[in-house]
Regions:
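Short, conserved beta-strand element in jelly-roll/cupin
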Residues: 34-36, 46-61, 99
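Short acidic-glycine-tyrosine-enriched beta hairpin
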Residues: 66-80
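Conserved short histidine dyad/triad with adjacent acidic residue
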Residues: 16, 31-45
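A short, N-terminal "cap"/entry segment at the start of jelly-roll beta-barrel domains
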Residues: 1-27, 111-129
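Histidine-centered metal-chelating micro-motifs
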Residues: 40-41, 60, 76, 80-86
């Protein structure tokens, strides 16, 4: 079990990785993300709930094809089974943390770039067929 008591805003601001798993427990997982200007998280659907808190930057949330703006201090709840994407429409990285319940990624997951994350997801799906 991971116990976490840190300044999450500072950790998010310092994060340079597209995806960085910070803590994983049996029923939840904490992940930091940094999305470059003009990029997105990627259209996806999870079998778990996801809560995203945006620390800095600006963009657009797309939940089941409905678009809405996001900015610093936005919180978005994505229920399991909801198709979603988050797009950075600003000029600076979109910085956020995400809580999955239960965990979505393997403990220790770290992707320097979105391309690394996409490649890892493809490998994961091939291995788990």
């Amino acid at each position: 079990m991971s116990i976490f008591n840190e300044n999450i805003v500072e950790l998010v601001k310092e994060n340079r990785f597209f995806r960085q798993e910070i803590a994983t427990n049996p029923h939840s997982q904490l992940v930091l993300m940094s999305v470059e200007p003009g990029d997105d998280i990627g259209d996806e659907t999870h079998a778990v709930d996801q809560v995203l808190f945006f620390v800095s930057g600006s963009g657009e949330a797309v939940l089941d094809q409905k678009r809405s703006p996001i900015a610093a201090n936005s919180l978005v709840l994505v229920p399991a089974g909801t198709r979603h994407n988050f797009i950075n429409t600003g000029d600076t990285p979109l910085k956020l943390f995400s809580v999955y319940a239960p965990a979505e990624h393997a403990p220790g997951t770290s992707h320097k770039s979105k391309a690394d994350a996409v490649a890892a997801e493809k490998e994961h799906h091939v291995l788990n067929r």
